[in-house]
Amino acid sequence: MIRDALPGDWPAIWPIFAEIVRTGDTYAYPADTDKSTAEVLWMTKPDRTFVFEHDGKILGTYYLKTNHEGPGKHVCNCGYMVSSDARGMGIARQMCEHSQVIAVAMGFSAMQFNFIASSNDVALALWKKMGFDVVGTLPRAFNHPTLGLVDAFVMYKWLSD
């Protein structure tokens, strides 16, 4: 079940966030992001944050926020994280599908992913399957912990027609 995240969910979200950010191979957050900073980034700054819960356990989370104010406010941005023990179960796909429905309900017309590491093959394949296009390449913009500097992609999908 996907539902809005509650403040009391943070203790279950934090280990997912911390593990993903510490590996340093997908998100551009500092690997040493502390718990309170992470909570603001994931739970406070976004317009909404959601959790994927199964049998009372939080297995994934995503945020949805306005990508830019003013003339670009019709475009939203999302970030998704899935617990390492729950990967390969289709949770990211379900959260992405859910986020698109919520985005349209919130008045957004498009969704943009700002910084997808070119080395993140699993995410790239999924987002492409879900109709997102690579609309920009940032050469050597992501410093991968083992591969060094790799490109980052901007991905985009129009949601309304």
Name what the model sees in each region.
Residues 1-13:
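A short beta-loop-alpha structural element at the N-terminal edge
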Residues 7, 26, 30-85, 96-98, ...:
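Acetyl-CoA-dependent GNAT
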Residues 14-31:
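Helix-loop element at the rim of GNAT/NAT acetyltransferase active sites that forms part
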Residues 47, 150-154:
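Short hydrophobic/aromatic beta-strand or adjacent loop that forms the aromatic wall/cage
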Residues 96, 120-123, 140-145:
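Short glycine/proline-centered loop/turn elements that form peptide/ligand docking sites
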Residues 103-116, 125:
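Conserved GNAT acetyl-CoA-binding A-motif
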Residues 112-116, 128-148:
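Conserved catalytic-core motifs of GNAT/GCN5-like acyltransferases
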